[in-house]
C-alpha cells in the first residue's frame, strides 16, 4: 500500500488498510511507519501520524490510513485502494459482509480503484466472508468463473496431502 501511496496520481486520494482487530491494525501500520522513518527521502515526503495510524504524502495530500474494523470506522470510507487484512478473522465477525461492502463501496466512482484481500489460514474451517471469497477465488482460478478483474493468488496444500495428514 505504500507503493500505491507513493505512485498515486490522484490529488488527495485515500488508501485504506482494514484490519479485523486493533492488534492486526498495529501489525499493518507499524512496518509502514518504520519504512518512512528509516528512509530520509520517504521521511521528507511523508508525514506519519501514529495516533491515528495515518501516513500522508506531503505533495499530493494522499493518505494511507489503517483502521480496525468497526461499523463506525468503516462508514463513509472513499478509498481508491483498500487492503482487507486477515480475511479469515472477518469471517468470524457478525455483519462482516455489510462492513466490507461499506468499506469498498466508494470504489465505484474511481476507475483506477482496487481491493486486495490478504489472509493466512484459520485453524478452523473457512467461515463467513472468508469462505465466500475463498470459494470465489478458487472458482476463478479453476476456470468455473470468468472474472478478468479478479486475480486469485492462493497457496493451498494439495488435497491428497491434506487428506493424508502429512
Where do the model's predicted regions map?
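Phosphate/NTP-binding elements of NTP-utilizing enzymes
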Residues: 1-166
Amino acid at each position: 500500500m505504500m507503493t500505491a501511496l507513493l505512485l498515486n496520481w490522484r490529488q488527495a486520494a485515500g488508501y485504506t488498510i482494514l484490519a479485523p482487530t486493533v492488534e492486526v491494525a498495529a501489525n499493518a501500520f507499524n512496518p509502514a511507519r518504520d519504512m518512512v522513518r528509516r528512509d530520509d527521502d520517504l521521511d521528507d515526503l511523508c508525514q506519519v501520524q501514529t495516533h491515528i495510524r495515518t501516513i500522508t504524502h506531503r505533495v499530493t495530500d494522499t493518505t494511507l490510513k489503517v483502521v480496525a474494523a468497526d461499523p463506525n470506522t468503516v462508514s463513509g470510507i472513499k478509498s481508491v485502494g483498500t487492503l482487507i487484512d486477515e480475511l479469515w478473522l472477518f469471517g468470524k465477525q457478525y455483519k462482516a459482509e455489510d462492513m466490507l461492502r461499506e468499506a469498498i463501496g466508494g470504489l465505484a466512482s474511481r476507475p483506477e480503484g482496487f481491493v486486495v484481500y490478504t489472509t493466512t489460514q484459520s485453524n478452523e474451517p473457512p467461515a463467513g466472508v472468508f469462505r465466500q471469497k475463498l470459494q470465489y477465488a478458487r472458482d476463478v482460478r479453476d476456470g468455473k468463473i470468468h472474472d478478468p478483474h479478479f486475480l486469485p493468488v492462493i497457496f493451498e496444500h494439495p488435497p491428497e496431502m491434506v487428506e493424508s495428514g502429512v
